[in-house]
Structures are given as structure tokens and as C-alpha cells.
């Protein structure tokens, strides 16, 4: 989201203020889990020269999913009012994730009489509509939104299947920052992160939770004796992943890196031989293109928007099944026809941000023209 906005602002045709509400929680610290971490988020900050405010909204246990759009809208409403009172007017609300943010954005659009564009990104469409009340709120928001963006065609198809009018949905894929993620000297990168020479190294990047399926990769390792695995991310599955590696006697070949800043991820992408994404759900996984931009091919599960990213031999291979055996088969296929790193980089270069940026600008202009007519 931040990168997409940076490129949009860099076009010189858009300016923006960001209101990014976070749940209210009274105590700070990792021992309080996700909410304790969110409590440390500042009220205001500047990121890449973009002013961002983080008003707090109430999340209620047990009933939280159904009422969160309303508490989020209430918190954002006060902050948007302050922004308007400061003399900064705006033309449209650009919301990311349909639920709860997009639902709240439509409420705010009605209150402030501003058009609303909502971007669907993944679980907001392929998971949350399984719950009756959120599903209805999502459909209501989709009906009332002035424009809808999906980060892949698969999400548009899913929304149409839910009953959303296709004419109001514009697929605009995420791009990749080709300057931030670029090839390095691979031997130097491997040495920098301490990789053993001669070992084929997999990298898995993402939150340590069941949906990301890092465990599936670990379960494949007994069938891959010359392969090591690096996992970058934090989350509730850390202890379970470590335990699984010990049970399978592959603990010496699995290294959990913890949280890795984006500035350092480039080194890991260049050091690895393959990025593996075994997720059960993805809209458009940025890590795939980040890896390819560094010249490293991928092996990925054949879900949602991923086939739209991994669409040529230079990009990598899709797993025939989301199983350890499927991963082993895909890796065997990749290693038998391993692409040149330069070819993988060239493939990624077709996924820069400019087409997406222009697509957003065109969409905003068309919506504002309709409103003015």
C-alpha cells in the first residue's frame, strides 16, 4: 500500500494525507501479542514524506468483527474532520482492504460527500465473506463504492461470484520497486548472511501463521537432503515451527530469521536459490516479484492471483499440489531447468509500478468527471 502510494504521489498528479486507524489497546509490549505491538504505533508520523495519522478505534471481543467497521469509521471521522479544519480539502477517499476499512470508508464518503475507491487485496475477499454479516457489509460497500480495484483478476472473478457488478471493478496489479529490489553479487550476498557453500537454499518470507504454510516447506525437507531453509518473519507459529523441525530432525537445516527489514531483504533474496511461497491464500504476493527482481526464481502454490505472477519459466514453477510432495516435485522441475538470474530479473522488469500508477490516475479522473457531470 505504501509503495503504491509513493509512486502515485511521485507522478506529480496526486497529493495525499493518510489516516490509518489502529486498534486501541492500553498496554504496550510483545508479551501482549499483536495488540501490544500496535499500542506502540505513534499517533502521528511521517513516512517517505507522507503525513500519516493513527487514530485509535475500539475492538470489542466476541462481537468485534461485526462492529469494527463502525468503530473504525468513528475514529477516522474525527481525524478527517481535523484535516479538513486545517484547510486541507481532498477529492476522494482511497481505501485499502474491503473489510473493515472499505466498509468504513463508504460510511465516511457519505458523511463527507466524497467519492470512495476501495482496493481488494486478498483475505478481505477470499476469506472474510465466509461470515454472514461481514459478507453483507462488503456487498453493501461494493454497491455504494464509486470504484473498486483488485490486485489481481482472480479477486475480481471472486467478487463477481459474490454478486458485485463487474463493470465497477478494475484489476490493477501491484508492482515491484525495481531499484530497491535488484541483483547483487550472489557470492557476496551468501557470505553476508552466513550461508554454507554448495547448499541449495530456500527462502520463505511472511508472517509465521498457518495460512503462510511455512510448516509445509519444513515437512518437505526430509525428502531434500541437500536443501536448507531460511524463514523470515515473526508470528504465533514460531515455537510450532521450531518443534516440527526438531521432530523431523531437520533443525540444523532450518533457520528462523525473525523480522527482517525490507532494506535487508534484498540481500536474502540474492543469497537464496529459490523463494518458496506455500500459502493457502494470496491476493497478489509482493514477495514473489521482490525475489524475481533480485534475479531469484520462485516456487509457489497455485492459488488466487499467484498464477498471474508466476506465468513463465523465467519466473519459476507452480506446485502441482499444496503438499510436501508437491513442493518436492516443483523444486525438482525448477532445478532441472533453472533459469538464468538475468532472465528472471528481465521478467520482473515487466512489473514496474508505472502502469498501475497510471491506471489509478485514470480511474480517479473518470470518477471525478462523473461526479462533476
What are the language-model segments listed below?
Residues 196-212, 218-221, 230:
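Conserved donor-binding/catalytic core segment of Leloir-type glycosyltransferases
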Residues 297-301, 305:
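Short hydrophobic beta-strand element within catalytic cores of glycosyltransferases
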Residues 17-24, 118, 134-186:
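Donor nucleotide-sugar binding/catalytic pocket of nucleotide-sugar-dependent glycosyltransferases
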Residues 1-48, 53, 355, 362, ...:
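N-terminal subdomain of nucleotide-sugar transferases
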Residues 259-260, 267-272:
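Short alpha-helical donor nucleotide-sugar binding micro-motif in glycosyltransferases
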Residues 36-41, 182-195, 341-343:
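A short helix/loop element that forms part of the nucleotide-sugar donor recognition site in Leloir-type
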Residues 261, 280:
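Aromatic "clamp/platform" in nucleotide-sugar-dependent glycosyltransferases that forms part
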Residues 312-313, 317-324, 333-338:
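Conserved acidic donor-binding segment of nucleotide-sugar-dependent glycosyltransferases
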Amino acid at each position: 500500500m505504501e509503495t503504491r502510494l509513493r509512486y502515485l504521489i511521485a507522478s506529480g498528479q496526486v497529493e495525499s494525507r493518510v489516516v490509518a486507524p489502529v486498534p486501541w489497546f492500553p498496554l504496550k509490549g510483545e508479551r501482549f501479542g499483536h495488540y501490544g505491538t500496535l499500542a506502540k504505533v505513534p499517533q502521528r508520523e511521517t513516512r517517505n514524506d507522507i503525513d500519516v495519522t493513527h487514530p485509535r478505534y475500539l475492538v470489542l471481543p466476541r462481537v468485534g468483527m461485526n462492529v469494527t467497521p463502525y468503530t473504525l469509521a468513528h475514529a477516522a471521522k474525527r481525524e478527517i474532520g481535523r484535516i479538513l479544519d486545517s484547510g486541507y480539502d481532498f477529492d476522494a477517499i482511497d481505501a485499502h482492504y474491503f473489510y473493515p476499512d472499505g466498509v468504513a470508508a463508504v460510511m465516511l464518503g457519505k458523511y463527507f460527500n466524497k467519492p470512495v475507491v476501495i482496493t481488494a487485496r486478498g483475505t478481505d475477499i477470499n476469506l472474510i465473506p465466509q461470515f454472514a454479516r461481514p459478507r453483507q457489509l462488503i456487498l453493501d460497500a461494493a454497491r455504494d463504492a464509486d470504484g473498486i480495484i483488485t490486485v489481481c483478476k482472480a479477486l475480481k472473478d471472486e467478487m463477481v461470484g459474490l454478486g458485485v457488478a463487474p463493470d465497477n471493478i478494475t484489476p490493477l496489479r501491484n508492482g515491484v520497486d525495481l531499484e530497491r529490489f535488484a541483483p547483487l553479487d550472489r557470492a557476496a550476498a551468501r557470505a553476508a548472511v552466513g550461508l554454507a557453500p554448495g547448499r541449495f537454499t530456500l527462502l520463505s518470507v511472511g508472517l509465521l501463521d498457518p495460512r503462510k504454510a511455512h510448516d509445509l516447506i519444513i515437512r518437505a525437507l526430509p525428502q531434500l537432503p541437500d536443501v536448507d531453509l531460511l524463514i523470515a518473519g515473526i508470528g504465533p507459529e514460531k515455537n510450532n515451527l521450531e518443534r516440527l523441525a526438531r521432530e523431523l530432525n531437520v533443525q540444523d537445516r532450518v533457520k528462523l530469521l525473525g523480522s527482517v527489514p525490507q532494506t535487508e531483504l534484498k540481500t536474502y533474496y540474492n543469497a537464496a536459490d529459490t523463494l518458496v511461497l506455500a500459502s493457502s491464500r494470496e491476493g497478489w504476493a509482493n514477495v514473489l516479484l521482490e525475489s524475481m527482481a533480485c534475479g531469484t526464481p520462485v516456487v509457489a502454490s497455485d492459488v488466487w492471483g499467484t498464477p498471474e505472477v508466476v506465468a513463465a519459466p523465467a519466473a519459476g514453477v507452480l506446485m502441482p499440489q499444496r503438499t510436501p510432495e508437491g513442493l518436492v516435485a516443483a523444486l525438482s522441475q525448477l532445478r532441472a531447468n533453472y533459469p538464468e538470474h538475468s532472465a528472471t530479473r528481465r521478467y520482473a522488469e515487466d512489473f514496474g509500478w508505472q502502469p498501475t500508477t497510471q491506471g489509478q490516475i485514470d480511474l480517479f479522473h473518470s470518477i471525478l468527471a462523473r461526479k462533476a457531470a
